[in-house]
């Protein structure tokens, strides 16, 4: 089974920085590469991924960043934002929420390490919760 998932940037960063191959964030990222997770995004989300992944403090090689972004674009799904009246504690997170809302008719999830930044909804999950759903 495949799962449509909007992936918050913090999940990608955590996966790439993790030294544990069995961590939940690494397993989520691996599921993107094996096709179990179909990433959902728009241009703003891709730009955020690119911007954050290129921050000097992370020292991720350009080739690795490009490979990840290319995989997301090739195997993922582009979605327009569904404009909502939601007020979030972190306004920059609104795009992730609105993109997942646009795909609710297809049972999409938003996976984040910062669930407190989003409304409590059953489709907004932590990496561990997503892995449980995928079992």
Where are these regions (language model features)?
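Acidic catalytic patch
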Residues: 43-46, 64-88
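Acidic, metal-associated active-site segment
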Residues: 90-109
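Metal-dependent nucleic-acid phosphoesterase active-site entry motif
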Residues: 1-20
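Membrane interface segments of multi-pass transport proteins and intramembrane proteases
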Residues: 58-59
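Short, active-site-adjacent cap segments at secondary-structure transitions
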Residues: 12-13, 47, 117-119
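PIN/NYN-family metal-dependent endoribonuclease catalytic core
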Residues: 6-7, 24-54
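Acidic, metal-coordinating catalytic cores used for nucleic-acid/nucleotide bond scission
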Residues: 86-92, 115-116
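Acidic, PIN/NYN-like endoribonuclease modules and their adjacent C-terminal/linker elements
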Residues: 105-135
């Amino acid at each position: 089974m495949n799962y449509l998932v909007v992936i918050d940037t913090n999940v990608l960063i955590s996966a790439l920085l993790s030294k544990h191959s069995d961590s939940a964030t690494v397993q989520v990222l691996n599921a993107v590469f094996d096709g179990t997770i179909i990433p959902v995004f728009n241009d703003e989300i891709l730009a955020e991924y690119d911007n954050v992944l290129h921050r000097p403090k992370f020292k991720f090689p350009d080739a690795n960043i490009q490979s990840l972004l290319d995989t997301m674009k090739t195997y993922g799904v582009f979605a327009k934002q569904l404009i909502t009246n939601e007020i979030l504690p972190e306004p920059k997170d609104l795009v992730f929420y609105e993109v997942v809302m646009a795909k609710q008719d297809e049972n999409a999830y938003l996976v984040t390490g910062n669930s407190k930044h989003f409304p409590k909804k059953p489709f907004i999950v932590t990496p561990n919760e997503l892995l449980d759903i995928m079992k």
